[in-house]
A protein has these predicted regions:
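Motif-centric detector for short Cys/His coordination patterns
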Residues: 1-104
Length: 104
């Protein structure tokens, strides 16, 4: 019998077993290109994030990588977003859109 109160989280598992971290990020056309240390690129629309969507471009461009590559921080907007959250949203959107997900 398992007496642990911990539950398995596949997103956390992927991040830690693969050692995923944010290597860099760029902003263009109201989207963030988030480059991971395995060269995977996540394209994130700012419309999904209230503080970023309505912010002036100068403030959107003022961010830094935090937590040893686990997130992004916008000091002037008081906004923090995580790699975990980006991946969670990616999986959620792809499942909701009923896209073909290939397991190879």
């Amino acid at each position: 019998m398992n007496t642990s109160n911990k539950s398995y989280d596949p997103i956390t598992d992927i991040i830690f077993t693969k050692g995923l971290k944010i290597k860099s990020a760029t902003h263009k056309d109201r989207k963030l290109d988030i480059i991971l240390n395995n060269d995977l690129i996540l394209v994130v629309s700012l419309k999904n994030y209230k503080k970023l969507n309505g912010a002036p471009l100068e403030e959107v461009n003022n961010f830094k990588i935090i937590g040893n590559g686990t997130g992004l921080h916008w000091p002037t907007l008081d906004e923090d977003l995580s790699l975990y959250g980006f991946l969670k949203e990616f999986f959620k959107q792809n499942i909701e859109k009923k896209r073909k997900l290939v397991i190879a």
